[in-house]
Amino acid sequence: MSEIIQDLSLEDVLGDRFGRYSKYIIQERALPDVRDGLKPVQRRILYAMYSSGNTHDKNFRKSAKTVGDVIGQYHPHGDSSVYEAMVRLSQDWKLRHVLIEMHGNNGSIDNDPPAAMRYTEAKLSLLAEELLRDINKETVSFIPNYDDTTLEPMVLPSRFPNLLVNGSTGISAGYATDIPPHNLAEVIQATLKYIDNPDITVNQLMKYIKGPDFPTGGIIQGIDGIKKAYESGKGRIIVRSKVEEETLRNGRKQLIITEIPYEVNKSSLVKRIDELRADKKVDGIVEVRDETDRTGLRIAIELKKDVNSESIKNYLYKNSDLQISYNFNMVAISDGRPKLMGIRQIIDSYLNHQIEVVANRTKFELDNAEKRMHIVEGLIKALSILDKVIELIRSSKNKCDAKENLIEVYEFTEEQAEAIVMLQLYRLTNTDIVALEGEHKELEALIKQLRHILDNHDALLNVIKEELNEIKKKFKSERLSLIEAEIEEIKIDKEVMVPSEEVILSMTRHGYIKRTSIRSFNASGVEDIGLKDGDSLLKHQEVNTQDTVLVFTNKGRYLFIPVHKLADIRWKELGQHVSQIVPIEEDEVVINVFNEKDFNTDAFYVFATQNGMIKKSTVPLFKTTRFNKPLIATKVKENDDLISVMRFEKDQLITVITNKGMSLTYNTSELSDTGLRAAGVKSINLKAEDFVVMTEGVSENDTILMATQRGSLKRISFKILQVAKRAQRGITLLKELKKNPHRIVAAHVVTGEHSQYTLYSKSNEEHGLINDIHKSEQYTNGSFIVDTDDFGEVIDMYIS
């Protein structure tokens, strides 16, 4: 045997084979035909059952027999895929009208697998037979099956618009389809209106076909999405569960779910809601129970007393499949090609199919009627000369000779002669002669009617309308899905998402933040906080998990962090660096942190920079829904840094202290409220090469503690400060020395909450009690606390 070797490139071979494969799965596997709404395997299953007489009026047959018939004659693929397709056609939570009735376990809405095919039994549903009706009247084209042993239909007659009624879903190479189920009566009514007016608009069609009608019911939101889908084939709607509220004997309420969105797995939904409860993602749910039984679907969500049930419901809509979005993608095979189709195109394609089906059926019936008429006319003629016919037949040698004699002597046709010789003697009575004459009249009327249908397009359309109306009357059902015009915005109260709990918030100067339970904090004490070497506590306070933390940095930016999003870490352990929560720059430093319970307040923030700029912005401006990146708090110019952020409930005095020992005190009422992107105004009139080291709020009972680079601490009382106007030079707080003058490196307002100070050099730190520092007069340089020869030059001071 000679070999033929072809020299082909791998790219060409792969491209050609994948192209063939793609065409096959698009046309022969995954996408439905627009005319009957069926994929090939579904069509083959229904036809195999019909051909074998497995119809609704007969007994159920083993599913395995049907699967075997389908595989053996039409669909040479795995038995499991055929059985899965067969089972889906029987599932009333998948199809709006099932096409197969099945006895036994055919799966469940919990996605349980069906029983094996050897255990289940099935037969066609009554409605499925409407898809196959008249298939034996040459209504559709047949093609050879895969092994040329029999024929199979290319499409079913489909006496109702099955694609819209039962919808379809599938994925193929480069294409996917998602067509939702609809109400049969509405679809037929819309089709009837389209027949009456082919120019009908989508808006007008939507008076009859309201939107999808899912077998699982539910509430559909978004008329605009439905309209868009019906116009273009693509659109989006919201499908939410039907949820009712019940009150129990103990006064508690429970949410009862009786309908869920289409194709949502009920058991997965119950599991997800229970996980939200167990993980404390939502506060207020006591228990989740699946109470579904043979009477219908029922999920009970028992709530705590006095909880806001509406907020719980909204949270579940947002965070579980209690509400989903459904995306229309109405792709179907039309004229052998996949097409994205609007509802008018789908109805038009279906109508053209029905015109062809009814025309073919009418031609078939007309041909049979004319053939029968020809036979009846021959029989009537024969009966009118009965004695001569009998004599001729008796004188003939055999049946064949009798037929030839009848044709030759009395001019009967071959068909008439065959009917005459086959006539039984009892048919020669007067009754049968009358019956033949009656049949002749009926055939005349039928032929006239059939010819009228073929010759008159309107008459043909009327036949389609009559048959559609019959199906509508016989199979109509109430709409299951409620349609709401607008998509409801889901608003979730923070109290529902986050259990209210008092915790300790801490922030270190190096930017490590955490929340700690009060029990862990009380078991340790402030001084036992987990810190890295060289780090210290910037701030700690009691907050609520429903509060928000604002973290301000030297770049004039702030981080918006809900407290409940902070890691819950023990007091003795190291916190989480803010950069792990919200990304910040490498040289960005945390300067202060504040807690906000409610942004709807008259409070305000004051921002002060090293170069003497200041501004005031109200707290509500800082509320945001973006948590993932730093936000602008104030504009900080190049070569400047934000050094102070203060929060005040009302206007009060602030004191500004500079490196060269100048001090200016004035009221925040001199500052106008500005937006977040403003740079502010001049706070103090700085000398050359001077800069601000402190801007803080001050009151009459406070003192001010200052540290100089030479290791000196100076403490002054409020009375030394002179209240003035903003942007002035201020007063001098240091005695100027010609050689190695003192320069203030840090200063803080000391209130009753402060008792200790800590001085820092590059390599050392010194602790002491603030009360050990005596108050000084205005023009002094304070008292030396450390020897800079040993300690090093002081670079900073903190108080606590």
UniProtKB/Swiss-Prot annotation:
The record marks R118 as: Transition state stabilizer. Residues 31-495 form the Topo IIA-type catalytic domain. The active site is at Y119 (o-(5'-phospho-dna)-tyrosine intermediate). The record marks K39, H75, H77, R88, K94 as: Interaction with DNA. Its EC number is 5.6.2.2. It is found in: Cell membrane. It is an enzyme of class 5 (isomerase). The keyword Isomerase applies. GO terms for biological process: chromosome segregation; DNA topological change. It catalyses: ATP-dependent breakage, passage and rejoining of double-stranded DNA. It is a peripheral membrane protein. One of its GO terms (molecular function) is ATP binding. GO terms for cellular component: chromosome; cytoplasm; DNA topoisomerase type II (double strand cut, ATP-hydrolyzing) complex; extrinsic component of plasma membrane. The keyword DNA-binding applies. Keywords: Cell membrane, DNA-binding, Isomerase, Membrane, Topoisomerase. Heterotetramer composed of ParC and ParE. Topoisomerase IV is essential for chromosome segregation. It relaxes supercoiled DNA. Performs the decatenation events required during the replication of a circular DNA molecule. Belongs to the type II topoisomerase GyrA/ParC subunit family. ParC type 2 subfamily. This is DNA topoisomerase 4 subunit A. It comes from Staphylococcus aureus (strain MW2). The gene is parC.
